[in-house]
């Protein structure tokens, strides 16, 4: 088995992840790296505030690898920081997921990390991973300029975004994680936020179409919501975005089973659901305050443009 050498490595860990358990995991990771010499040299930094992981990754010049230890939020920040670096010197990304969703980790084949077993780091290979770029316009900002955000797994608008964003407070109340958390959030948000979200959409420069979207997911990987296979055929290395959207009006009594059927990818042939690949998407929202999320992080916008950046990031994944 070929042993992985990450080279000069920066470990960015969110100590608050998994209700604070990630601090202990970071300590165990440090001892593992010392014992196994998987990196020629490594530095460990604990994040101190929101946005800190992005800053650290953006400043990680000279490193061959950046390891993100935490939930989807810290991984999303690290990806956004790395994407500010020039591609020629951009470090590779490795992840150790200690969060509630972990869809990007599942896409990479890391689906059983417990915080104690670092075997996923023993034998890894590099792959070039597509990254999504979102340009968003928020009239409330007053600048008229687009904000830029990158994502590694999922972008969604509508009830599915409301479900993802709703997990933050629900996790604090219930202590749930993974699929049970997202399923409970789905049941709650279907009562609070279920409606049509009218928008105008255009894919790859085609004429714009007005749709009454219930959900709109623009994926790099196949899953969101801790394993819901919303775009079962999505491949994060094919240079394409995979889109799933469902158009209303659809009664709640029909929409809820449709949503639950996405757990196993059985929704794709249902009448309200449309599936398509694209490289570029433009969406204009007819009303303010639509729920929008990218890798679980909120976006406020009246219009967005989405592009795929093919093979933009080197990512370490376990060798299977």
Segment roles from a protein language model:
Residues 1-69, 76, 116:
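ATP/NTP phosphate-donor binding region
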Residues 16-17, 71-74, 98-101, 157, ...:
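Short glycine-rich anion-binding loops that position phosphate/pyrophosphate groups of nucleotides
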Residues 23-25, 79-82, 106-108, 229-230:
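Short amphipathic alpha-helical segments
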Residues 47, 84-214:
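Catalytic core of DAGKc-family lipid kinases
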Residues 74-87:
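Short Gly/Thr/Asp-enriched flexible loops that form oxyanion-binding sites at enzyme active sites
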Residues 156, 160, 217-231, 298:
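Glycine-rich phosphate/pyrophosphate-binding beta-alpha loops
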Residues 203-210, 229-320:
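ATP/nucleoside-binding phosphotransfer catalytic cores, i.e., glycine-rich phosphate-binding loops
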